[in-house]
């Protein structure tokens, strides 16, 4: 049966979420915008991801955390929901770490994507 599902993400930082979506080459739009399921059930989202089948998905901030909103029956992304969330959370964590290291005066020197899917980040800070 078609219905909108909320999936917990533990994502709290909007800018890092948007950077993570960009890093995964996922096109998104700022909200508020409405998404709906087959039966017309609607939900307003803060970040919208359009799908070719017109059953769009998105993120809504509830309390402190963003939740993924989707009609899972009509999921149309290149990955399963689980893989999508895993990759999104990895990129989100990477963005949080990178932003924090830059704020602390470090500079990114290099990043490597290993065969196992992990990301290796090399930073440095000059002391004067």
Curated annotation (Swiss-Prot):
One Gene Ontology cellular component: cyanelle
One Pfam family per UniProt: DUF1257
Record has Flavoprotein as a keyword: no
Keywords: Cyanelle, Plastid
Compartments in which it is found: Plastid, Cyanelle
Family statement drawn from the similarity comment of this UniProt entry: Belongs to the ycf35 family.
Protein's name according to its UniProt entry: Uncharacterized protein ycf35
Organism listed in the record: Cyanophora paradoxa
């Amino acid at each position: 049966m078609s219905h909108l599902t909320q999936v917990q993400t533990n994502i709290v930082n909007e800018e890092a979420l948007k950077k993570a979506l960009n890093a995964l080459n996922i096109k998104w739009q700022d909200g508020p915008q409405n998404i709906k399921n087959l039966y017309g059930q609607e939900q307003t989202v803060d970040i919208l991801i359009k799908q070719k089948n017109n059953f769009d998905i998105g993120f809504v901030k509830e309390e402190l955390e963003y939740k993924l909103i989707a009609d899972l029956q009509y999921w149309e992304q290149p990955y399963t929901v689980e893989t999508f969330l895993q990759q999104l959370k990895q990129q989100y964590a990477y963005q949080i770490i990178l932003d924090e290291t830059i704020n602390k005066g470090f500079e990114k020197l290099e990043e490597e994507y290993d065969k196992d899917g992990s990301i290796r980040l090399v930073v440095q800070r000059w002391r004067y």
